Structures are given as structure tokens and as C-alpha cells.
Regions:
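Glycine-rich phosphate-binding loops of nucleotide-dependent enzymes
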Residues: 1-185
Length: 185
């Protein structure tokens, strides 16, 4: 960050199926490392970083979150990225909506397709079942307990296809003890 070195001599190797945890005090650089791996703009706007990132044995330049997602990297952020007025399914499928063709879209293009809400709900239910969250896919996120919102964030990442590395930034910070235990199972 600016002229301050936040991380130095960091080396991390993760193999498929492994789970790793970074431990350290507040300000130790855990979130900074995760932001580097996900190409978050804050890294580049505060001076960038030196070094290399290898993914699947190949050096990569993760310049933004879109590039990270193309590589198969997903991230559950410390701050919620949900839209309160949307349903659970709309949040889980945001940016990856399933649509179906209409008469108008067949003439004027894809932008006039209709959301296939049953298909979106079905995908969402699979992700919610995977993490054991018994919330309705059509429920609005606004007003839900923060633990539910954290699990919805996780469901969104699980629902993505091609995920090879899933990064969690303090996933249990807002969870109750029983919710944290369920997540870690």
C-alpha cells in the first residue's frame, strides 16, 4: 500500500481438494493476499505487488476479478456483495442468469430474452442443499440473518461452473458457533 510493504516472501502452494487457512492478527496481510489472488482493484490502485502468481503450474497475471473468474478462482468476500431487494436465487445467479428465448428475442436479439426463473431456482436449490441452507430460493435477502447471507454468498460461488480455487475471506466472522461448525463440515 503506497510505500509500505504489506507482504514479503510469501509462498503458498495449494493442491486440488486441499483446505488451507491463513492465521494472523488484524493487519497481518491475509486479506491483502486474497485480494491479490482475486485481482481486486484495491491492489492495483495502491501500488500493485511484486512477484509472480502461478496457477496450475503456469505464471498468470490476475489483473482483475474477471480474469480470476476466467481462471476458475472464486472468492467469498469479508463484506457482503448481495443485493437486499433481490431474491436468494437472483443473488446466487447474478451475472449468470438463465434465460429463455421469446418471440421478440428471436427477432431483436438476446437482450429481450425472459429470465428462466424455474431453472435459476433449481440451480440455486442445488447450491443451497450443498451447504445445508434451508432457505427458500424466492425469499428476499433483505432482513435475513447475517449468517444466512454469508451462506448465500458461499452458495453463489459454489453455483459457478469451473471453480478450481475458492477463496474465503473470514467466512466465519459473522456466523454463530453452530453456523461456523456447519460451514467447516
Amino acid at each position: 500500500y503506497g510505500n509500505n510493504t504489506v507482504l514479503s516472501d510469501v509462498s503458498l502452494s495449494v493442491k486440488p481438494g486441499e483446505i488451507h487457512a491463513l492465521l494472523g492478527e488484524n493487519g497481518a496481510g491475509k486479506s491483502t493476499l486474497m485480494n491479490i489472488l482475486f485481482g481486486m482493484p484495491v491492489i492495483h490502485s495502491t501500488g500493485g505487488f511484486g512477484g509472480t502468481i502461478e496457477f496450475n503450474g503456469t505464471p498468470v497475471n490476475i489483473e482483475n476479478p474477471h480474469k480470476a473468474m476466467e481462471l476458475g478462482i472464486g472468492m467469498v468476500h469479508q463484506e457482503f456483495m448481495l443485493i437486499p431487494g433481490f431474491t436468494v436465487a437472483e443473488n446466487v445467479k447474478l451475472g449468470r442468469e438463465i434465460s429463455s428465448q421469446t418471440v421478440a428475442s428471436s427477432i431483436f436479439g438476446k437482450s429481450l430474452e425472459r429470465l428462466d426463473k424455474p431453472a435459476m431456482a433449481e440451480d440455486t436449490r442445488v447450491a443451497l442443499n450443498t451447504i445445508g441452507l434451508g432457505v427458500e430460493d424466492y425469499a428476499r435477502v433483505a432482513g435475513m440473518p447475517v449468517g444466512y447471507m454469508q451462506f448465500i454468498e458461499i452458495a453463489r460461488e459454489i453455483d459457478k461452473t469451473g471453480i478450481k480455487l475458492l477463496i474465503f475471506d473470514e467466512p466465519t466472522a459473522v456466523l454463530t458457533e453452530s453456523e461456523a461448525e456447519r460451514l467447516l463440515e
